[in-house]
C-alpha cells in the first residue's frame, strides 16, 4: 500500500466516528461568550487596541490556550482507540505494511483534523463577527488575510504539540494514562 491509500483508510475509519462533531463543540463554545459579552470589547481602558482586534484576540485565546490542546489529545486517543477496540492494529500489522508509513498516516490524519478545526474556527469567527457587527452597529469583521495569517500561525504552532501527543498516545496503551499526560 502506498502512503495516500493508508491516509485514505485512516480517513474512512474516522468517518464513522464522532470526531468531527467533537471538533465542532469547542469551536462553538469559544465564540458564544464573545457574542454575549460583545459590549466589553469597547471597554479598553487605555489599551491601544481596536475593538475588532480585541474581539478576534479574545475569541482565539481560549482556542489556543485550552481547546486546541484538548482537542488534539482527544483526537489522538480516539484515533488509537479505534485501532485497539476492534483489534484493527493487529490486522493492519499482519499485512505487509510499513509501521512507519502507518504511524505517519495517523499523524497526517491528526494534522488534517487540526486543520479542519482551524477552518471551522475561521468560519465561526466570521459568523460571530457578523452577528456582533449587527448587534453593536460597529464593524467587527477583520480582513481575511489578517485572520488567515494568524490562524495559520496557530496551526503551525500546534503541529509539534500534535506530534508529542501522538507519540505519548502510541507509547502508553491505556487511554486514561495517555489523556492524563
Regions found by a protein language model. Name each.
Residues 26-74, 104-173:
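Secretory targeting signals
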Amino acid at each position: 500500500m502506498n502512503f495516500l491509500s493508508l491516509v485514505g483508510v485512516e480517513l474512512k475509519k474516522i468517518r464513522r466516528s464522532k470526531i468531527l462533531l467533537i471538533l465542532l463543540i469547542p469551536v462553538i463554545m469559544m465564540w458564544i461568550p464573545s457574542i454575549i459579552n460583545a459590549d466589553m470589547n469597547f471597554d479598553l481602558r487605555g489599551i491601544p487596541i481596536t475593538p475588532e482586534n480585541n474581539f478576534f484576540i479574545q475569541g482565539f485565546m481560549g482556542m489556543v490556550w485550552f481547546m486546541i490542546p484538548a482537542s488534539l489529545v482527544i483526537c489522538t486517543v480516539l484515533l488509537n482507540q479505534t485501532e485497539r477496540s476492534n483489534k484493527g492494529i493487529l490486522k493492519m500489522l499482519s499485512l505487509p505494511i510499513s509501521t512507519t508509513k502507518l504511524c505517519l498516516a495517523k499523524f497526517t490524519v491528526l494534522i488534517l483534523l487540526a486543520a479542519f478545526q482551524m477552518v471551522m474556527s475561521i468560519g465561526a469567527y466570521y459568523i460571530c463577527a457578523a452577528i456582533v457587527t449587527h448587534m453593536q452597529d460597529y464593524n467587527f469583521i477583520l480582513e481575511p488575510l489578517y485572520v488567515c495569517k494568524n490562524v495559520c500561525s496557530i496551526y503551525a504552532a500546534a503541529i509539534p504539540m500534535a506530534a508529542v501527543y501522538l507519540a505519548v498516545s502510541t507509547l502508553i496503551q491505556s487511554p486514561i494514562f495517555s489523556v492524563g499526560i
